[in-house]
Amino acid sequence: GLWQLIKDKLKDAATGFVTGIQS
């Protein structure tokens, strides 16, 4: 559903953010 899509987007954003910090 919509909520699952939102959670997936937030997860991707968080992962990208963490990756950017570590690099």
From Swiss-Prot:
Tissue specificity of this protein: Expressed by the skin dorsal glands.
Key words, A-Z: Amphibian defense peptide, Secreted
BP-aspect Gene Ontology terms: defense response
GO cellular component: extracellular region
Intracellular or extracellular location(s): Secreted
Top-level taxon of the source organism: Eukaryota
Purpose: Has no antimicrobial activity.
Protein name: Dahlein-4.2
The organism's taxonomic lineage, starting at the top: Eukaryota, Metazoa, Chordata, Craniata, Vertebrata
